[in-house]
Amino acid sequence: MCGIAGIFNIQSQTPELRNKALRMAQKIRHRGPDWSGIYVGGSAILAHERLSIVDPESGGQPLYSPDHKQVLAVNGEIYNHRDIRARYAGKYAFQTGSDCEVILALYKDKGIRFLEELNGIFAFALYDEETDDYLIARDPIGVIPLYIGRDKDGHIYFGSELKALEGFCDEYEPFLPGHYYRGREGKMHRWYTRDWMDYAAVKDNYTPAAERNAAPASIGRTAYSTQVTAVHDALEAAVQRQLMSDVPYGVLLSGGLDSSVISAIAKKYAAKRIETDNKADAWWPQLHSFAVGLKGAPDLIKAREVARHIGTVHHEINYTVQEGLDAVRDVIYFIETYDITTVRASTPMYLLARVIKSMGIKMVLSGEGADEVFGGYLYFHKAPTPQAFHEETVRKLSKLHLYDCLRANKSLAAWGVEGRVPFLDKEFLDVAMRINPAVKMCPGKEIEKKVVREAFADMLPQSVAWRQKEQFSDGVGYSWIDTLKAVTAAAVSDEQMAHAAERFPIHTPQNKEEYYYRTIFEEHFPSESAARSVPSVPSVACSTAEALAWDASFKNLNDPSGSSGGTRRSIQGLKKELPTDFLPAALLIFYLSNPIGLKHHCLSANHTCHSTRYGNNKFQNHIPRFLHKDYPLSD
């Protein structure tokens, strides 16, 4: 994980512009604390903040072509770089061992028409001194964040985060995933497109002609087994590709299906270095797994069980509700959104990332993307047809860069940790999204993501392989969301809500929790561009707006993460109802005042260790620190 920032279309280089680019880069130095680099020349300035993972010694950026005519700043990882290097052996004089340098070799050979050859997560800016032109591009799904802006003088700006552009240019917006921007044309082009984005291209896949009109449950076992095997093999290959690293790495293990599958596969291959085609022993053969939650949370219990089963060195991070509340203001600054679901889920991940960083881990694999690809959210039980199901998965993938990808990337990057997501691997998507949608469906009480469960059931405890979906922010502890609702409801008055549209005419908050997050967001990012960068659409249980038409009961539900009692009943109808009434104010204050302290537990087959991560933190004056406007960005 790194940070990039810069300016194009410069008519005359000045010290002021260079200083501006440096200040832009400094805003995102948390993403790349290992080294800073800058290029100033021609009509461009490119700045780079590096987190060194591959080739730490010589892979500093910006990168240059052998003749120094092309310069490149990249945030990302190119998983197939070894294959590309082999193709250009003897044709291109590579200057470093960086995986990203293959972008320069491809550009030299093919101009701008090379993006499809990359399998990885990336956002990059390339300047060509010979043509005085530039290219900006982003990966297919938008795993790596990127923004583009402009000013009244015609300069084009780019940056990994909002904070690199806020206050530096007149307007900006998210750079679209799967697109590139070419300077001489001055417009965005889509480079990533797939046949599976159209239902007609996948509706008969893997299915014999005689079964094509059959109900999902009656599709032949042979055809079904073929799809299960395809998913298994493609995901194992994706995880193995993404284990490339010259520094210590780990896995995020929530105890849910998705992270457990990724962790189990990673453990299978962790003992050998993939850079040597698994011939040499890994430099760090012990795989470390990490889980976070309130004490006794469902996720922690299951994560512990999985870790014992697959044999990782497991680290369990306990946080208190108060510590979560104290972190909210920081979290909103780093993740750059006021979306309710994202803030709720990002807070424990942000706290976890700090501990991971303190242990010297620079990269972790995570399970994001499986719910979008396989229809794992509980509302998918209501999908009326295979076509509706498939089209919703495509919509969900197209919006991931605004939600889960943003959360996973920025929560970790806040502490200089890189997150990799094998379920969103480009080659894996081409297999998984071509699976017959009828096979993925989970009508009624049938469990979701059955294909994934059957593909990897033999690698996991059965209680986890067939465990039903939890929202991440529920799994870390049910009282977390309920307390957020209660505290933010007390912080925002009815009168403020009545005038919400006057204060926030763009994406007006629909409830007090959103209003409060929006207030904090505006303190950090006051521009209209910032407000428009965050999506604001009707949702239930993480659905898109289009899926609300699947069931009449969805219209009366207003919790986007699906954690309210009504949502649980309507979406699931499967799990025992959990109490979600708000705590009375006096009890809430008493509960939050308990000085439990964030704890780190290390569990492995050989030892158990416990260490207090933070000291006791009383509830000063019975008011959470995050409610104070002057609460600092860091302790």
Model feature map: region roles:
Residues M1, A214-A217, T222, S358-L365, ...:
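Adenosyl-5′-phosphate
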Residues L17, T96-D99, L118, Q227, ...:
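Hydrophobic (often cysteine-bearing) scaffold residues that line and stabilize catalytic clefts
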Residues C602-N616:
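Compositionally biased, low-complexity peptide segments typical
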Residues I361-D371, Y377:
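Short acidic/histidine-rich active-site segments
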Residues M1-Y338:
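Cysteine-centered catalytic environments shared across enzyme families
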Residues L104-A105, S260-A264, A353-R354, G375, ...:
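Short, hydrophobic alpha-helix immediately C-terminal to the catalytic nucleophile
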Residues N9-S12, I121, S346, H401-L406, ...:
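Short, motif-level signal for alpha-helix interfacial/capping segments enriched in acidic residues
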Residues V292-A353, Y379-A388, K410-S411, R434-C442, ...:
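ATP-dependent adenylate-handling ligase core
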